Regions:
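Compact soluble domain cores
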Residues: 6, 11-21, 25-98
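Enriched for short, Lys/Arg-rich terminal
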Residues: 119-144
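Sequence-level detector for tyrosine residue identity
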Residues: 69-72, 86, 114, 134, ...
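Functional cores of ribonucleases/endoribonucleases
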Residues: 79-126
Length: 144
């Protein structure tokens, strides 16, 4: 959502807290998809690798390079996610099918990594990982 404040446009991200049961169900579905025999990392995991020239350290490409990670390392970290690492849910203003993005914070090599993802599709489900980068702000964990 974009709002005007003193004549300047600012972007507002709508945040909510999913119920614990919803997070558990999301993680079960995520692990089922990642554990399928026919899981194809090239088509079943969509990883957004957008650079942030104004904040490179908090971008997915920088974090992957710093951790020496590839897509399979991300899959391994996604399989490890727990309810206790859940932080919040955000409304995906760019794609309302489904509208919720689940946000997790995971300690990797002594640094907090911000992970934002959702599961898309009806017949053929895919994992959309919008963010996998070092956390810019402190995170809260309602179920820790």
């Amino acid at each position: 959502m974009i709002a005007l404040l003193f004549g300047e446009a600012i972007t507002i991200f709508l945040s909510t807290q999913s119920k614990k049961r919803e997070v558990v169900d999301f993680l079960k579905e995520l692990n089922n998809l990642l554990g399928k025999d026919d899981f194809d990392i090239d088509t079943d995991l969509i990883l957004i690798r957008k650079r942030k020239p104004d904040d490179e350290e908090h971008s997915t490409p920088f974090t992957l390079l710093d951790l020496d990670y590839d897509a399979w390392d991300i899959v391994d970290r996604l399989k490890e996610l727990t309810v206790e690492e859940y932080s919040e849910s955000k409304i995906d203003k760019d794609d309302l099918a489904p509208p919720l993005l689940f946000v997790f914070g995971k300690n990797i090599s002594g640094k907090l990594v911000y992970i934002k993802l959702k599961i898309k599709g009806d017949q053929k489900k895919r994992i959309l990982c919008v963010s996998f980068h070092y956390a810019k702000e402190p995170m809260t964990f309602p179920y820790a």
